[in-house]
Amino acid sequence: MLCGVTVLFLRLFPIVAALMGCLGLIGCAHTPVSLTVFEALGIGKNVDAIKLNPKLRYLRVSTPDRVALMVLGYSVDSLEGAVETWYSSGGEVLKLQNGRVVSSAGLYTDWRSVKYSGLPTWRQVIDKKIAEYSRTRDQMPAYKFGIQEQLVLGAVATPDNTRLLGVSASALHWFEETVKGSQHGWPSARYAIGFKDFAPTVVYGEQCFANDRCISWQTWPASF
């Protein structure tokens, strides 16, 4: 299995490298300020105009002042849901499971080994509108290990301050996740759920890694 994953990544990496430089979403490990290849060439920040390879899957990732694309390297099935590993050519990695961040690397603030306990399915969340569960994670830098948090996930009205593109926000079910006992519920998250083949699917997500370090993502191009 590992050999197959390695071969796939080596095959994808030149394509990713040609697509963009350091992701620069909330920082890059080797430069304080990073631009994509397209910005460096003067084409600007509009990655939405890039011609996509139909054989690859893309993730549109953004912050308030920067947008970039990541490419799916591989997906590993598990009982809790497939873990998708997304890459940028600058070395940033984002792992998602059921639309939630379970690991990151190469950002200013990284989460590692994210584990949930008592996590409901998205269908259960949609039916009940609210849920509580726990999360354990490690955080870098500062070597914070085994951070334990109690989370509350609840339905919210359709927001008007998202970075969602190509999909009507009002057509989705919106939920906000907050940390109990923390100031303003940080680090918070937000999810938009739609139905694909009658199954609830995360169409759009936001995650704050710290009070001022937030990213959003959606599969690209928008197809819901």
Placement of each model-derived feature along the sequence:
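Bacterial N-terminal signal peptides that target proteins for export
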Residues: L2-V16
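Homeobox/homeodomain signature
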Residues: I15-A18, A49
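C-terminal motif of bacterial Sec signal peptides marking the signal peptidase cleavage site
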Residues: G24-G27
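Surface-exposed, glycine/proline- and aromatic-rich loop segments on solvent-exposed faces
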Residues: W111-G118
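Acidic, serine/threonine-rich low-complexity disordered tracts
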Residues: A29-S103, S113, K129-F224
